[in-house]
């Protein structure tokens, strides 16, 4: 990867991550299909219950419709984790930019933030579906939901900042890097808030005895599938940005040549 300070040039095609796109796409398709089948055909329902009509489980009236909330979990949690991973990569590239002032790192951070926003929106949608099925309402001002909503707003603010400083590359890159790092600070808060605040009613899944073996396997299959999908989407966005940069460079070169002939 070449380029001095302020360089915005991304590497040419043919780098080793580009060679992983097709295998990752195939892996995403296979694992997500397998995860869907495992979630709906193999993994046990809530508390291992087989509900016929409406039954009383753990003091709650449960129906087949309500049991869908447990199936949503197999997709809700993986997309949330992928959004955290994408934010981690964005924060890494933002730090690289702040250290080196090379704009290509800012571009990589922007690509990762786009993927993070996609998966954050998916997390919010699946989370609202789970909330509606499980708690009977679309939204609860519960600590986990609230902190994740704050995270989404910060990520949206990242793109607002980039638009606000569209004509000033230095400020755009610096301020957006700061917002990116601020969003990443919220990640451990989102993860730990249910453990730190006893009043939180959001379930804590990753704890001892929280998942049976078949549920954990289904969750891992879905997680691998969404991780592969996230990587593919990132490389597609990265490739599109690379083409846009090359096009802009060619247009600039042609303009300079025309000016020289004149």
Predicted features and spans:
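Polytopic transmembrane helical bundles with strong interfacial aromatic enrichment
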Residues: 2-262
């Amino acid at each position: 990867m070449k380029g001095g300070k302020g360089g915005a040039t991304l590497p040419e095609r043919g780098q080793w991550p580009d060679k992983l796109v097709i295998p990752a796409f195939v892996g995403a398709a296979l694992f997500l299909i397998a995860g869907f089948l495992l979630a709906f055909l193999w993994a046990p329902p809530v508390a291992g219950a087989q509900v016929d009509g409406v039954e009383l489980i753990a003091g709650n009236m449960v129906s087949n419709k309500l049991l869908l909330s447990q199936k949503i979990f197999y997709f809700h949690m993986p997309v949330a984790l992928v959004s955290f991973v994408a934010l981690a990569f964005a924060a890494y590239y933002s730090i690289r930019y702040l250290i080196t002032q090379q704009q290509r790192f800012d571009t990589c951070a922007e690509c990762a933030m786009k993927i993070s926003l996609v998966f954050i929106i998916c997390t919010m949608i699946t989370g609202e579906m789970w909330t509606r099925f499980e708690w009977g309402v679309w939204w609860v001002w519960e600590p986990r939901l609230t902190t994740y909503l704050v995270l989404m707003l910060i990520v949206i603010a990242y793109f607002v900042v980039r638009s606000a400083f569209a004509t000033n590359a230095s400020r755009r890159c610096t301020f957006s890097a700061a917002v990116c790092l601020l969003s990443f600070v919220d990640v451990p808060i989102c993860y730990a808030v249910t453990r730190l605040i006893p009043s939180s009613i959001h379930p804590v899944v990753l704890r001892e005895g929280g998942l049976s073996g078949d549920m954990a396997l289904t969750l891992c299959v879905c997680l691998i599938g969404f991780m592969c999908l996230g990587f593919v989407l990132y490389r597609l966005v990265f490739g599109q940005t690379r083409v846009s940069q090359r096009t802009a460079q060619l247009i600039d070169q042609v303009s300079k040549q025309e000016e020289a002939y004149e």
